[in-house]
Amino acid sequence: MSFVPTKVFFTKGVGRHKEYLSSFELALREAKIEKCNLVTVSSIFPPQCERISVEEGLKSLSPGEITFAVMARNSTNEHGRLIASSIGVALPADESVYGYLSEHHPYGQTEEQSGEYAEDLAATMLATTLGIEFDPNKDWDEREGIYKMSGKIINSFNITQSAEGQNGLWTTVIACAVLLP
């Protein structure tokens, strides 16, 4: 059986509950993917895969369906602890070439910091496969310009969810790329 996704949507959520597992369930509910049996996969954005809206993607899902996703997930039960989960995306200019999805799930990073880091990871992975020369010690903004000026990377972005832990509760954050046939 061969399955190469043709569509993808991005979603995120946060959940809080006294139980760890229930906080994860609530994050899935906020992301609107709680009805799926999620199977996590690694980080390839398939060639010619179309990005669709969450609403459009949800229409094609059935309760209990085996659903493939790249998921970043983080949890804490520490009051005031900042957590984040990010999916970074880097897409090549040539749609017949695969792109990259990266997962990042830090403690102590803001939503912006986590998102930029995940985006940087994905773009750097793609740049190395495309033979783009760059200095890995340069900051993300400078490398992003090099990647895009090469003409080989057309777009990069991220989806990120962050939250602070609350006293007496588990807090879980997720960010997902849901891959569809």
UniProtKB/Swiss-Prot annotation:
What is the catalytic activity of this protein?
A: L-arginine + H(+) = agmatine + CO2
> Which UniProt keywords are present, listed alphabetically?
Decarboxylase, Lyase, Pyruvate
Q: Which Enzyme Commission numbers does its entry carry?
A: 4.1.1.19
MF term (GO), any: arginine decarboxylase activity
A Gene Ontology biological process in which this protein takes part is: arginine catabolic process
Site, as annotated: Cleavage (non-hydrolytic) = 42-43
Source organism's superkingdom?
Answer: Bacteria
Tell me the residues on which Pyruvic acid (Ser) occurs: 43
Claim: Lyase is one of the keywords in the record: yes
Q: Which cofactor does it need?
A: pyruvate
Query: Which Pfam families does the protein's record reference?
Result: PvlArgDC
Does Lyase appear among the keywords?
yes
Q: Which SUPFAM superfamilies match?
A: Pyruvoyl-dependent histidine and arginine decarboxylases
Paste the cofactor note: Binds 1 pyruvoyl group covalently per subunit.
Question: To which protein family does this belong?
Answer: Belongs to the PdaD family.
Q: What is this protein called?
A: Probable pyruvoyl-dependent arginine decarboxylase
Name the source organism.
Prosthecochloris aestuarii (strain DSM 271 / SK 413)
Its gene? pdaD
